[in-house]
């Protein structure tokens, strides 16, 4: 069977939910027995989002092979339950840097290097390579931004050319747009969608399907109007209504036969999608009996997208405990030794997620101290683990000036220090310890119990600093347990205090491996402890 290519574009406004639509379609096609992969084209000039502020871009999602990517890849992985690779996120910066590098090496044999064909060929190669490296039947490619953006033009041209390259039967274009409701007029307006499709047609792409994002059901008359003006079949005008839970969306799209229309267009003769297990999960999510309150103490709490995988992993762990997770967003800058009890006292559990830089770290340290002293279940992640070690050094070991060398290079007690292979690194982008690495678990520890007593777990990392092993014996003598280490015993991966209900921190990012139907072990153990604390109140 020829590989099938589905391209998802957006119009009218950004942040319209293209990624969720693409991921939901991917889930439906996977449940039809197809092997699916998915990728995101981001038209910004950055090489990747690794050096971008979370306020600009949200979280950085890390793949198994160490690519720093768009947060939409997290949605893709959670919905479709696949592990993506570096070909799943492509930026303008990445493409141009590769083309320019080839030009400097003389690989274009003296040709004038241009957007067409060199940039578009490079983009098409990324699409085909993503499909080829995963041996996929179907690849879904989402283009970030909206039709009409200057930055998107080479990407859309590459998508247009794909139809001629691989054949019309192997390509489908899906366009997502906003269908606004004007309260004063009491009606929905189709003109923005019509103009968006007109713009797309002007670039040589005729959409085969429209997905309209709307707050209210559009009705068949609106669908017929859009079908007529945009030259798509009426049944191929699909509604994407606002929902209470994101995981309802694949079921809503299936009810409108979206996946069947796609299969018919691409001439895919495959069984209907069996969504029984997914439906049961959604039903459970919508009828959780318990509630648990988690304080998330972070640096970027004004923008929840900066912690989107953390939030989703907490929700998944809640599902496993029949509990709805309510998150209290606490600005780490506001936490002091004087007000910690006031800010954190109502929490059943506390999570200190990752981050970079000095701002907010003292507040996080006070948060960790409060959790340790008051025996509140706590999970520290990445920087959260590093600051857990700093807090213990200061307030248990009596090393008052202890710190991380990242935060204070002159500290006399560098509990956290630069990794040896990072000493001569000058560039910020793409130079961290990235991707999947193993952690050997200590038998009898809470970490081992969280992972069903496995000997080794593999999780994704994104860090430059590590625990300073010169202090390991001193910590262990005071009851601090290093419950996860690298197989060569050099790098600390997980720490815990066994006397507490649940006081565990890890260097890696467990949230990146969580799935709604398969929650991550440490997150599940943490939320379980928080639920137990809640029931004891």
UniProtKB/Swiss-Prot annotation:
It catalyses: UTP + L-glutamine + ATP + H2O = CTP + L-glutamate + ADP + phosphate + 2 H(+); L-glutamine + H2O = L-glutamate + NH4(+); UTP + NH4(+) + ATP = CTP + ADP + phosphate + 2 H(+). ATP binds at residues 15-20, 72. Allosterically activated by GTP, when glutamine is the substrate; GTP has no effect on the reaction when ammonia is the substrate. The allosteric effector GTP functions by stabilizing the protein conformation that binds the tetrahedral intermediate(s) formed during glutamine hydrolysis. Inhibited by the product CTP, via allosteric rather than competitive inhibition. CDD domains: CTPS_N, GATase1_CTP_Synthase. GO terms for biological process: 'de novo' CTP biosynthetic process; pyrimidine nucleobase biosynthetic process. CTPSs have evolved a hybrid strategy for distinguishing between UTP and CTP. The overlapping regions of the product feedback inhibitory and substrate sites recognize a common feature in both compounds, the triphosphate moiety. To differentiate isosteric substrate and product pyrimidine rings, an additional pocket far from the expected kinase/ligase catalytic site, specifically recognizes the cytosine and ribose portions of the product inhibitor. Belongs to the CTP synthase family. Homotetramer. This is CTP synthase. It comes from Streptococcus sanguinis (strain SK36). The lineage of its organism: Bacteria, Bacillati, Bacillota, Bacilli, Lactobacillales. The gene is pyrG.
